[in-house]
């Protein structure tokens, strides 16, 4: 698995754990998780950046998600799908340091959904991220 994909999966797992450890900071959770993964420094730094940036921009990301999830209430989405979408929306709309092409970013997160979520999630996530990408190009 390449560094970019691994950092996304680590960030996903840390953000998922954050839901159940509300009193813990992202840094505390990331430090606890870091020992569970064999991460090189670049991957570790990227995963930490993704985690903290999604939390920092959570309100803006949520607003974008709500506007692009037609016929879907965000509060009814599966938790893991919601986290995958938040990570991807951060990368598509806010991450100016990453030069990953948008289509590749979307494809990578659809692959994450295939691995961590239900069979139907990949289509749902792909559809929302495609809408986000199209609107961010304008």
Please describe what each predicted stretch is:
Residues 1-122, 126-138:
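N-terminal interaction/assembly modules
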């Amino acid at each position: 698995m390449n560094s970019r994909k691994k950092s996304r999966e680590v960030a996903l797992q840390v953000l998922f754990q954050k839901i159940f450890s509300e009193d813990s900071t992202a840094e505390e959770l990331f430090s606890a998780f870091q020992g569970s993964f064999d991460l090189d420094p670049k991957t570790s730094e990227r995963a930490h950046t993704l985690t903290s940036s999604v939390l920092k921009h959570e309100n803006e990301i949520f607003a974008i998600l709500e506007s692009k999830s037609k016929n879907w209430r965000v509060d009814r989405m599966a938790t893991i799908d919601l986290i995958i979408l938040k990570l991807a929306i951060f990368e598509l709309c806010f991450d100016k340091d990453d030069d990953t092409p948008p289509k590749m970013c979307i494809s990578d997160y659809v692959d994450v959904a295939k691995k961590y979520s239900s069979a139907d999630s990949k289509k749902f996530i792909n559809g929302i991220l495609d809408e986000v990408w199209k609107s961010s190009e304008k």
